[in-house]
Amino acid sequence: MKTRLALLSLLLSGAVPVWAQAPFFQDKTISVILGGPPAGSADLRTRAVINVLRKHIPGNPTILIQHMGGGGGRQAANHVYKVAKPDGLTIGSMGAALVTNAILGEPGVQYDIDKLIYLGTPDSAQHYLFITHGDAGLTSLEKLRAASNVRIAAQSVGHPIYITGRVFAYLLGLKEAKFVVGFTGPEIDVALAQREADARVSTGDSLIRRNRDWLDKGLVDVHASIEIPKGERHPRFAQVPELASFAKSDRERKMIEMFRAFRIAGQNFFLPPGVPRERTQILADAMRKTLGDPEFLKEYQKLSGEAASPLAAEALEKVIKELPRDANVVELFNKLGGADPLPGR
């Protein structure tokens, strides 16, 4: 009787009991601010996530993408951090540059990566390979390290593949390596085949997908790899030396750790500081369910051409917090990302 009277009193007062309240996100629209252009790889990865994320958020809100590609994604990150209301209705999506730009002190960064709220990433693992064309005659690591003026093809100064090539060349101790830039990704393969370049960096999966015959016919030599995360070897290249084994100092080892952490950060999904804890938890839980959803895994493979390698919110936050930030390591990484000759060791 008392329970009935209490319920009647509640209804007459106009208050809505907690169990009867609609989910916060019901009939709402979430804007995903993407630091990249339409139809690019970041766009495809982001779409693979949001196509499934909606069903895991109570209330099934509408989710729309807004592209902000200016400043290599910095405009998007700055907007989420400084402009967006911290109400859970704005989510940022940006590649590893979100973390890289902040740690390396790039101009135009107006956000603090330690204050952003991370939801997770669908893209945390990668296996980079340093390969040379068979016609270059660099059939062993010893011959590669003894050679001078090895021509390494890449897209542009500062591009992730360019920086990765410089990291390989530096730690392998290549003599006066020459970086030939100005290619698209597919054009690098053509440049290698037509002997306009001797070497390139590729991911293991991309090499198998695009140029399996190069491997099957022994047309290229694979000299070293970078495992991301550490210890996770690509089954096809398990016997290839890992680049960290060539580090000579603690500074160089930390530089490799920094490189790994930058890549593990992958396609970050994040919130501005100050989003209420309850809404943050709802979105983090929804992202966790999405990243483990078979529908998402299939969608990601279809759109990106690669298998997803998800990392949930807590693990992603841990990677970023533990990232080496020593000034001398940052200085070395910045030199490797630039256009000047490789620094001495």
Stretch-by-stretch model annotation:
Residues P122-G134, R151-A169:
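Extracytoplasmic ligand-binding site segments that recognize negatively charged/polar headgroups
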Residues L89-G92, V109-L129, R151-A153, D221, ...:
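A structural signal for short loop-to-beta-strand junctions that line the ligand-binding cleft
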Residues P37-A39, A96, H133-L138, Q155-P160, ...:
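Short coil/turn segments
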Residues R210-L291, A339-R345:
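C-terminal lobe and pocket-closing loops
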Residues A20-Y118, I161, L171-W214, L291-P310, ...:
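N-terminal (or domain-start) structured segment
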Residues A6-P17:
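Bacterial N-terminal signal peptides
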Residues K28-P38, K143-I161, A197-D198, D221, ...:
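Short loop->beta-strand "edge-of-pocket" segments that line small-molecule binding or catalytic clefts
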Residues I103, G120-A146, H223-A238, S245, ...:
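Hydrophobic/proline-rich hinge and linker segments of small-molecule sensing/allosteric domains
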